[in-house]
Every structure is written in structure tokens, then in C-alpha cells.
Amino acid sequence: MEALVYTFLLVSTLGIIFFAIFFREPPKVPTKKVK
């Protein structure tokens, strides 16, 4: 059960950081920056 909680926390933290960086930068070319 602990592994599940730690995995969820890790994923949520990475998601928050990703969204923070994504919304921080001005979306100049969204299609090229996605992949």
C-alpha cells in the first residue's frame, strides 16, 4: 500500500511541476513543443 501512495505522490508532483513550467512559458509553437 505504501508503494501506491508514494507512486501517486511522485506522479502528482511531476504533474504539478510540468503544468507550472508549461503555463509559465508562452505557448509560441505548441505542436512542436509537445513531442
Swiss-Prot record:
Function, as annotated: Found at the monomer-monomer interface of the photosystem II (PS II) dimer, plays a role in assembly and dimerization of PSII. PSII is a light-driven water plastoquinone oxidoreductase, using light energy to abstract electrons from H(2)O, generating a proton gradient subsequently used for ATP formation.
Topological relation to the membrane, as annotated: Single-pass membrane protein
Main location: plastid
GO cellular component terms attached to this protein's record: chloroplast thylakoid membrane; photosystem II reaction center; plastid
Membrane-crossing segments per the record: 3-23
Entry's family note: Belongs to the PsbT family.
Lineage: Eukaryota, Viridiplantae, Streptophyta, Embryophyta, Tracheophyta
Pfam families per UniProt: PsbT
Compartments, as annotated in UniProt: Plastid, Chloroplast thylakoid membrane
Protein name: Photosystem II reaction center protein T
GO biological process: photosynthesis
Keywords: Chloroplast, Membrane, Photosynthesis, Photosystem II, Plastid, Thylakoid, Transmembrane, Transmembrane helix
S-S bridge residues: none
Subunit architecture: PSII is composed of 1 copy each of membrane proteins PsbA, PsbB, PsbC, PsbD, PsbE, PsbF, PsbH, PsbI, PsbJ, PsbK, PsbL, PsbM, PsbT, PsbY, PsbZ, Psb30/Ycf12, at least 3 peripheral proteins of the oxygen-evolving complex and a large number of cofactors. It forms dimeric complexes.
